[in-house]
Amino acid sequence: MTLQWYTNAAMETPRRAPNAARSFTVRELGHVSLFVRDLDATRRFYRDVLGLAETGTAKDGRIVFFSAGVHHHDVSCELARAPGPGPQPKGVPGLYHIAFDVGVSLDDLARARRAVEAAGLPPYGQTPTSLCVRDPDGHEIELYVDVR
């Protein structure tokens, strides 16, 4: 089964680009690292709202690691040393969003929606299989279901 996404293009099982000259292979995305303004607010969002496990800290507690369960960490958040400009407007170079797979059914997505709404986070940018919220620093977080 293919899934129609934002465009008319179907989402097929990905295939690696052929490249005989490549001397290594990227197996998967390892983690995302973010600078944040408030580690307590960040913990509440990633741990308490999204349900990621807090797996450790580094640099005297200035970095917190969160895991979805397979790796030591999928997200690391480091306390910023200076205030930042906030989220980038859409369409300019920079991080657009981070997406988390929350299940395989629309019921799974509905549970995610109820959880973020209960935390006072208004979902936006919904598609039939996803929704978005902002973390405490304004990073766009997409929650989606993979309904292939």
Language-model features, listed with the residues they occupy:
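Acetyl-CoA-dependent GNAT
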Residues: 80-82, 146
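Short beta-strand/turn micro-motifs at beta-sheet edges
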Residues: 18-21, 82-89
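Short coil/turn motifs at secondary-structure junctions
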Residues: 71, 103-105, 148
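Core segments of cupin and vicinal oxygen chelate
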Residues: 23, 35-80
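Vicinal oxygen chelate
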Residues: 1-23, 28-37, 86-148
